[in-house]
Amino acid sequence: RPYQLPDIPDSLVTPDVRSEYLIAHYWDNFDIENRAYLDAREIPEQAFVDFTSIMRIASRESTLKSIDILLKRASSDEDILLMYADIADKYLYSGEGHLVSEEAYLPFVKAVLDSKKVDKLRKLRYSYQYDVLTKNQLGMELTDFEYKLPGKEKKFRVEKLKAPFVLLYINDPECDDCSLTTLRLSVSQSLLKEVREGRLVILSVYPDGETDEWLGSVEKYPKEWVVASMENGDRYFDLRIMPALYLVDKDKKIILRNTSLEEVEKILKENK
């Protein structure tokens, strides 16, 4: 049967208080553990889509508590837990919904990995996601990795780059958004000035190793940049959205993540 939203008490009148109540009690009337939903997935999926709509107006704390309620009940059954984790992947992580939230998705990943009911093979995908979700987040130190220059054998490490700021630009010359971003970064006079003054290193990285296609495109990048490739970039970075821009400071601490040229220029200007 379709789920029924909780009745919000009439005494709660302001939108924020009503949304807090709604998200706190969202799963009260929903039969989360019902195995019939495994063959009627559209019902829990629609319930989850509506839940993400309320997430947008509810507080972070209330949202995470409500997710915890859902997972505690779902965790009693391996198939039910995996169904909700898959739905959450679709609407919170893979970008098929109107809200992407790694913070809200991470509890689903942890629940699957912590479950004694789920076998190792079915955990593999979530184990990989956990690695990506817990690396290279805002405020963290950038995970060190090796890169190499076009046609050269010698490998370099990011931690050895000496500059007040490093702009890590992960991109693929075959992707249209990447081509546009490359153009915008290359015509930025303020970035060029920072590079020439030694305050900024722009490290453009192709994440899939030194391919012939990539080698054929390296001439398109500005000569002031460090243009390089790395192996297995998807083990270090979340590459669902390309290009990816990270601004790190002299200690390789991430101060901007999945950012824009405007944000980078603003931070560099503020830190003159």
Regions found by a protein language model. Give the residues of each.
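Non-catalytic, surface beta->alpha helical segment in thiol-disulfide oxidoreductase systems
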Residues: 240-272
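Active-site lining segments that contact anionic ligands and/or coordinate catalytic metals
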Residues: 162-165, 197-200, 242-243, 251
